[in-house]
Amino acid sequence: MGQSEAMGRLWMTWSIDGVGSAGQNVADVEAACRALVGSVERSRRAFDTPEPWEELRAAALLLQDRILGSGRETLDQGRKWASTLSGLSILLIPRE
């Protein structure tokens, strides 16, 4: 799975509208996806009805595809990558 040095460590921040934001170091884009989707899964209790959370979860799964595609390509070039979709925002920054 030939990952470059830039992919070895990432700083990740994300925010969920109406819920909060967080940041952490992750090993690679796959770990970033797990952290993002896991955070959205845990946010379910913050919603009174299932519909907003289901939309948020769908957005997280779409963002996961973006992270594994254009996100990986951008980070491989040593550049930061960000995306926002339906109340969910993420920023990934390569660390040395």
What feature does the model see in each segment?
Residues 19-34:
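A short, exposed loop/beta-hairpin motif centered on an aromatic-Gly-Thr core
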Residues 42-96:
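Short, mixed-charge low-complexity intrinsically disordered segments
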